């Protein structure tokens, strides 16, 4: 049996879209990109979306835009892709790994607040959604609000995750998505985006990208 690694849904008019983009003279950040950012923003219910080349870029730029100090720390799950950790380490931050739940693959929220209380250098929570399982974001954001922490979701596996009003209210928050070939939405092999309702953060990420 031959089971494909992925089988993306390619629209019939893709050739025309590509040709029109090339003929426009805008080979980057053209009208198609702006249109995509607007449509994704409306779909995800975030006020701002920045199209990028990968989810990794989204994680990196979000942390860079916040200008954390070297030696600051971030919470991340023990089970995750290497980018979740390396983006912070590249900027001089240190990870504090949180163990998984006994009945799933996501970080155990029971450990989060204890870690924050013990270490004032923790400035960021990076939850990762995995394999169709979503973190309890309302609970995570409530903890982040209590301690003034930045929440950066690694949603490479969850571009179509359900959103709630609690997220919309909390501006110290961003979400990074992946459009790699085997993800929910693909952009011909590679791609990503960063979503946030914080205009200042979105503007800075656009400048950095």
Identify the role of each PLM range.
Residues 62-117, 126:
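Conserved PLP-anchoring active-site segment centered on the Schiff-base-forming lysine
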Residues 200-209:
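Glycine/threonine-rich helix-loop capping motifs at alpha-helix boundaries
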Residues 1-27, 31:
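N-terminal "arm"/small-domain region of PLP-dependent enzymes with the aminotransferase-like
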Residues 10, 28, 80, 103-104, ...:
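Glycine-/small-residue-rich active-site loops that bind phosphorylated ligands and cofactors
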Residues 26-73, 87-91, 97-99, 166:
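Phosphate-binding glycine-rich loop
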Residues 50, 75, 96, 151-152, ...:
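Structural detector of well-ordered beta-strand residues that form the stable sheet scaffold
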Residues 103-187, 193-201:
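Active-site phosphate-binding strand-loop segment of PLP-dependent enzymes
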Residues 84, 140, 205:
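Aromatic/hydrophobic pocket-lining residues that form π-stacking "cages" and hydrophobic walls in ligand
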């Amino acid at each position: 049996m031959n089971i494909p690694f992925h089988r993306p849904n390619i629209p019939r008019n893709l050739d025309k879209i590509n040709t029109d983009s090339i003929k426009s003279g805008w080979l980057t950040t053209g009208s198609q990109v702006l249109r995509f950012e607007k449509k994704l923003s409306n779909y995800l219910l975030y006020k701002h979306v920045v199209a990028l080349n990968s989810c990794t870029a989204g994680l990196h730029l979000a942390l860079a835009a916040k200008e954390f100090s070297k030696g600051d720390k971030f919470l991340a799950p023990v089970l995750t892709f290497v980018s979740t950790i390396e983006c912070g380490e590249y900027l001089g931050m240190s990870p504090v790994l949180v163990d998984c739940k006994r009945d799933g693959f996501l970080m155990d929220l029971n450990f989060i607040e204890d870690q924050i209380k013990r270490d004032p250098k923790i400035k960021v929570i990076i939850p990762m959604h995995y394999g169709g399982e979503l973190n309890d974001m309302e609970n995570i954001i409530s903890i982040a609000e209590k301690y003034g922490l930045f929440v950066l979701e690694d949603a490479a596996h969850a571009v179509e995750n359900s959103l709630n009003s609690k997220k919309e209210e909390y501006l110290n928050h961003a979400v990074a998505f992946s459009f790699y070939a085997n993800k929910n939405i693909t952009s011909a092999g590679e791609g990503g985006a960063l979503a946030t309702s914080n205009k200042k953060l979105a503007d800075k990420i656009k400048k950095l990208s």
